[in-house]
């Protein structure tokens, strides 16, 4: 059996090169076998893209990344056009290789020590009031990147004292307590970590992750910061049943998670996990009713919902679909 070639630092692996390195074989989808997108998933482009160009220019100027671009989010046009963005720190190369995700895999470069300051300056220049900070997985770092998160939060608040910050963190595999110790010095206004799918689908969708570890991360943060909302998100359409999703919602509530996002999985390329089905809006509505009954303070459920989609409105408790 041939061993994978040694990864070179800074080289991005995408599509076939990326998924070739996971234990579950992904068969490239043929066009005739791919499900046709239903009408409710048609993305409307904005009338003006000027704001989008301005935000992209600001990101390029400071060498920053947005998960909106790196993960090929379908809501990029809408969010950018409304002057919001989710910033991705710690580079654009992930040490994991989840086959649902379009972010590149490889050996990341060392963290940019100037990134926290550049990020804070960019947010000030963009006059944002609510930001989401996320990252690639950095299993190569002793703290999983926790200190860099804390540094970014601190610098952002120095230049933007009235801002609200949501963090969408990785699972800090094997380093949960150490990471939370570090983050306790600079806690966010909302703490988000996505479970992504039901536990039965972790082996194919989240190689290297563990369902219970992710639940424990959310619960332990909440135990340390009982007044800070915790949040998690799930994709639908990977082959899970609605009852499996319902059970995940119950698990989240039993681990004191208060905010929820449910959205439709979209296949980034033929080399990624295929869409098993497109979930009708009515089923998202039914799960929204269940989430409310379970006691989530806010649940955004709909085909186009993503974890950071209109995150400011989610934090305010306003309906997002």
From Swiss-Prot:
Q: Which GO terms describe its molecular function?
A: 4 iron, 4 sulfur cluster binding; lipoate synthase activity; metal ion binding
Q: Which Pfam families match?
A: Radical_SAM
Name the UniProt key words of this record, in alphabetical order. 4Fe-4S, Cytoplasm, Iron, Iron-sulfur, Metal-binding, S-adenosyl-L-methionine, Transferase
Task: Please tell me where [4Fe-4S] cluster 1 binds in this chain.
Answer: 68, 73, 79, 308
Q: List, separated by semicolons, the cofactors it needs.
A: [4Fe-4S] cluster
- Top-tier EC class: transferase
Could you give the cofactor binding note from the entry? Binds 2 [4Fe-4S] clusters per subunit. One cluster is coordinated with 3 cysteines and an exchangeable S-adenosyl-L-methionine.
Give all residue intervals belonging to the Radical SAM core domain.
80-297
Top-level taxonomic group:
Bacteria
Membrane recorded as keyword:
no
Which coarse location class applies to the principal site listed for this UniProt protein?
Answer: cytoplasm
Instruction: Cite a GO CC annotation.
Output: cytoplasm
Positions that bind [4Fe-4S] cluster 2: 94, 98, 101
EC number, as in UniProt: 2.8.1.8
User: What's the catalysed reaction?
Assistant: [[Fe-S] cluster scaffold protein carrying a second [4Fe-4S](2+) cluster] + N(6)-octanoyl-L-lysyl-[protein] + 2 oxidized [2Fe-2S]-[ferredoxin] + 2 S-adenosyl-L-methionine + 4 H(+) = [[Fe-S] cluster scaffold protein] + N(6)-[(R)-dihydrolipoyl]-L-lysyl-[protein] + 4 Fe(3+) + 2 hydrogen sulfide + 2 5'-deoxyadenosine + 2 L-methionine + 2 reduced [2Fe-2S]-[ferredoxin]
Which pathway does the record list? Protein modification; protein lipoylation via endogenous pathway; protein N(6)-(lipoyl)lysine from octanoyl-[acyl-carrier-protein]: step 2/2
* Family label: Belongs to the radical SAM superfamily. Lipoyl synthase family.
Sorted alphabetically, which NCBIfam families does this protein's record hold? lipA, PRK05481.1, PRK12928.1
**Protein name in UniProt:** Lipoyl synthase
Q: What organism is the protein native to?
A: Shewanella denitrificans (strain OS217 / ATCC BAA-1090 / DSM 15013)
Lineage per the UniProt record: Bacteria, Pseudomonadati, Pseudomonadota, Gammaproteobacteria, Alteromonadales
- Gene that encodes the chain: lipA
């Amino acid at each position: 059996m041939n061993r994978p070639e040694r990864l070179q630092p800074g080289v991005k692996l995408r599509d076939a090169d990326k998924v070739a390195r996971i234990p579950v074989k992904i068969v490239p989808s043929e066009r005739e076998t791919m499900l046709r997108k239903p009408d409710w998933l048609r993305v409307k482009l904005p009338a003006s893209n000027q704001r989008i160009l301005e935000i992209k220019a600001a990101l390029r100027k400071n060498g920053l990344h947005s998960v909106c671009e790196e993960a090929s989010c379908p809501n990029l046009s809408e969010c950018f056009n409304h002057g919001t963005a989710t910033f991705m720190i710690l580079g654009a190369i992930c040490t994991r290789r989840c086959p649902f995700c379009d972010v590149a895999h490889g050996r990341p470069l060392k963290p940019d020590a100037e990134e926290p300051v550049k990020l804070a300056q960019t947010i000030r220049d963009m006059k944002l009031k609510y930001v989401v900070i996320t990252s690639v997985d950095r299993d190569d770092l002793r703290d999983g990147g926790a200190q860099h998160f804390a540094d970014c939060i601190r610098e952002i608040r120095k230049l933007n004292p009235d801002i609200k910050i949501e963090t969408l963190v990785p699972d800090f595999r094997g380093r949960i307590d150490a990471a939370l110790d570090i983050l306790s010095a600079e806690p966010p206004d909302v703490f988000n970590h996505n479970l992504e799918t039901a536990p039965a689908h972790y082996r194919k969708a989240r190689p290297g992750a563990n369902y219970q570890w992710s639940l424990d991360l959310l619960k332990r943060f909440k135990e340390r910061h009982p007044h800070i909302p915790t949040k998690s998100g799930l994709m639908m359409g990977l082959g899970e049943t609605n009852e499996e999703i319902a059970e995940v919602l119950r698990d989240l509530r039993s681990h004191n998670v208060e905010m929820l996002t449910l959205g439709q999985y979209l296949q980034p390329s033929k080399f990624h996990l295929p869409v098993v089905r497109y979930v009708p809006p009515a089923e998202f509505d039914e799960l929204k009713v269940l989430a409310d009954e379970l006691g989530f303070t806010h649940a955004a459920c709909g085909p186009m919902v993503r974890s950071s989609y209109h995150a400011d409105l989610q934090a305010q408790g306003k309906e997002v679909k």
